[in-house]
Curated annotation (Swiss-Prot):
Matches recorded under SUPFAM superfamilies: L30e-like (SSF55315)
Keywords noted in UniProt: Ribonucleoprotein, Ribosomal protein
Keyword Ribonucleoprotein found: yes
PROSITE patterns cross-referenced by the UniProt entry: RIBOSOMAL_L30E_1, RIBOSOMAL_L30E_2
Protein name: Large ribosomal subunit protein eL30
Molecular function GO labels: pre-mRNA 5'-splice site binding; RNA binding; structural constituent of ribosome
Record InterPro entries: Ribosomal_eL30-like (IPR039109), Ribosomal_eL30-like_sf (IPR029064), Ribosomal_eL30_CS (IPR022991), Ribosomal_eL8/eL30/eS12/Gad45 (IPR004038)
Coiled coil: none
Length: 105
């Protein structure tokens, strides 16, 4: 029961970031924001391909950005951010009113 409750909590925090903060969706924009040093946190879906995931981890390590591995796949991550399409990676640029940066990392 605890993992489901934790997942709901993360989804709520993510929804608050979408509402009040700044974020980007997708691989290309994530790499761009990591290279510019603007990213605070990246959230990677569970079914992201291994090569793409390792490249994101590498850029996150270079820019000293926190990485969170979302428990669900890209369909669930897309639903969590309120989109009707699949999302493999979400980059949090500014958390807004959410405390996602302190709780996830």
């Amino acid at each position: 029961m605890a993992p489901a409750k934790n997942q709901e909590n993360i989804n709520q925090k993510l929804a608050l970031v979408i509402k009040s903060g700044k974020y980007t969706l997708g691989y290309k924009s994530t790499i761009k924001s990591l290279r510019q040093g603007k990213a605070k946190l990246i959230i990677i879906a569970a079914n992201t391909p291994v090569l793409r995931k390792s490249e994101l981890e590498y850029y996150a390590m270079l820019s000293k950005t926190k990485v969170y591995y979302f428990q669900g796949g890209n369909n669930e991550l897309g639903t969590a951010v309120g989109k009707l399409f699949r999302v493999g990676v979400v980059t949090v640029l500014d958390a807004g009113d959410s405390d996602i940066l302190t709780t996830l990392a």
